[in-house]
Amino acid sequence: MTDNSKTRVVVGMSGGVDSSVVAYLLKQQGYDVVGVFMKNWDDTDENGYCTATEDYKDVAKVAAKIGIPYYSVNFEKEYWDRVFTYFLDEYKKGRTPNPDVICNNEIKFKAFLDYAISLGADYVATGHYAQVERDENGHQHLLRATDSNKDQTYFLSQLSAEQLDRVMFPLGGMIKPEVRKVAEEAGLSVYDKKDSVGICFIGEKNFREFLGNYLPAKAGKMMTLDGEVKGEHAGLMYYTIGQRRGLGIGGGSKNNEPWFVVGKDLSKNILYVGQGFENSHLYAASLDASDMHFVNKLGEERGRDFRCTAKFRYRAQDVPVTVHFSEDFSKVTVDFDDPARAITPGQALVLYDGEECIGGGIIDAAYNSEKKMLQYI
């Protein structure tokens, strides 16, 4: 039996059930486990209530129960500088960013990893649902989790082989009900705590209200691509491609079909809308993405043109595509086998080869079958 007692694993503990079970399992396996609570955002509300304080209390309870030391580290400045300013800049450009992808790369597996190493860590572990495998040549591979409903490789697609070398994802081979069962049987007080959802720094707050605190909103015309004014928008940053809710337009022509956001014109401050879920302006034949990154060195060995599958939003199913990389592999054009709906600039494009996540980048633009740019951003 392997003696793990000399291997120190620092666990990123959020106070939730997933990371608590990670700490418990590693402790059971004999590792030298240390818990660390990351405070990335000051979420104190107008009544002085801070959810982070409650979460930290849960970390303390779990750590005491399983018998491990725990610390708290403040990454608010790093988060503001590396994640939140990016988030705001993208919204200023009329795009819809995914801060979780940046947070994982810059905070959880960079700032936190560096901090863990300063505590003598051999590895860090988190409650992410993903798997890491090393092949016979020493290359790290990022694989989907067993629980396809919880798989988080989409958010981990910007990690490097060097980062994965130091990472453990103990929940990768488990399904969520099993995780809760382990927590309950181990007597962990968080076994029935509800999962956190949405962007961490917004939490339960109203998104429109939150964004309005940081960026000035400028109302403007809401119109069809034929130039018919349908109403007024509250500010382009509040809308995303394919959005239906919150437009304030009834049916009308086309058998009372619902209206959707089909584009934005930043220079004229116009929000374009169209009727029908199947509206042709929502469907792309291809997209361009930049800031492309491969998880390991094997990515570039595939050549600049190859077949794979791609995912362009977290909850979407990945679809078959052909990719065409630029000479330095930093940009890519992706051709879809079948038209893809509501491709959104600013979101992450993530590439897969079967169960393996091979890398990803950020979507810049989408095009129809005639190579005309959609969304008019």
From Swiss-Prot:
InterPro entries: MnmA-like (IPR004506), MnmA-like_C (IPR046885), MnmA-like_central (IPR046884), MnmA-like_central_sf (IPR023382), Rossmann-like_a/b/a_fold (IPR014729). Residues 98-100 are annotated as: Interaction with target base in tRNA. ATP binds at residues 12-19, 38, 127. Keywords: ATP-binding, Cytoplasm, Disulfide bond, Nucleotide-binding, RNA-binding, Transferase, tRNA processing, tRNA-binding. GO terms for cellular component: cytoplasm. The active site is at residues 103, 200. Residues 150-152, 313-314 are annotated as: Interaction with tRNA. Its EC number is 2.8.1.13. The record marks 128, 347 as: Interaction with tRNA. One of its GO terms (biological process) is tRNA wobble position uridine thiolation. It catalyses: S-sulfanyl-L-cysteinyl-[protein] + uridine(34) in tRNA + AH2 + ATP = 2-thiouridine(34) in tRNA + L-cysteinyl-[protein] + A + AMP + diphosphate + H(+). Disulfide bonds join 103-200. It is found in: Cytoplasm. One of its GO terms (molecular function) is tRNA binding. It comes from the Bacteria. NCBIfam families: PRK00143.1 (NF001138), trmU (TIGR00420). Catalyzes the 2-thiolation of uridine at the wobble position (U34) of tRNA, leading to the formation of s(2)U34. Belongs to the MnmA/TRMU family. PANTHER family: MITOCHONDRIAL TRNA-SPECIFIC 2-THIOURIDYLASE 1, TRNA 5-METHYLAMINOMETHYL-2-THIOURIDYLATE -METHYLTRANSFERASE. This is tRNA-specific 2-thiouridylase MnmA.
